[in-house]
Amino acid sequence: MTKAFDSALRLLSRREYSAMELCDKLKQKGFNLHDVQNALNECKRLGYQSDERYVESYIRARIHQGYGPLKIRQELKNKGIDPDLIQSVLHQEKDNWVNYALRAWEKKFKRQDDFSYSEMQKQHRFLLYRGFDRDVISKVFKEVKSSYLI
């Protein structure tokens, strides 16, 4: 085995990396492109590196942190992940986005008793910034209004 492959294994033993991230890390360590590609191909062949596994774990972590599909999709695209792969994994969660957005709202605003127009706008912007689309946000506010009798 090569030094690039050994270095890739050490990196992958700590956490999942996308193929592009792993390639960048190995290049930063001073390995030439040919060795990096060989190490990356060997890691994929042996199942040590998988973009699918990376996407699933990344999405799970970001959902847990209160982020929505738009922000997650953009972050993964910036990490060099195939958009079709991103879409297929995000699609598996499509029925849960309202619950995830409601959980993010509750974490930030649960103890809030001010439901003025400006406060609702602030809450709307917060959910938009977190990556939830307008349809999901409107469903969250319908739920909030019904449960808090606004």
UniProtKB/Swiss-Prot annotation:
Spell out the Pfam families in the cross-references: RecX_HTH1, RecX_HTH2, RecX_HTH3
What are the annotated disulfide bridges?
none
**Key words of the record:** Cytoplasm
Primary residence: cytoplasm
Q: Name one GO cellular component term.
A: cytoplasm
Please indicate which superkingdom the organism of origin belongs to: Bacteria
Q: Does the keyword 4Fe-4S apply?
A: no
Q: Where is the signal peptide?
A: none
Q: Name one GO biological process term.
A: regulation of DNA repair
Compartments, record wording: Cytoplasm
* Keyword set includes Iron-sulfur: no
Q: Which InterPro entries match?
A: RecX_HTH_1st (IPR053926), RecX_HTH_2nd (IPR053924), RecX_HTH_3rd (IPR053925), Regulatory_RecX (IPR003783), WH-like_DNA-bd_sf (IPR036388)
- Into which family does the record put it? Belongs to the RecX family.
Summarizing the function annotation, the protein's role is: Modulates RecA activity.
> What is the name of the protein in this document?
Regulatory protein RecX
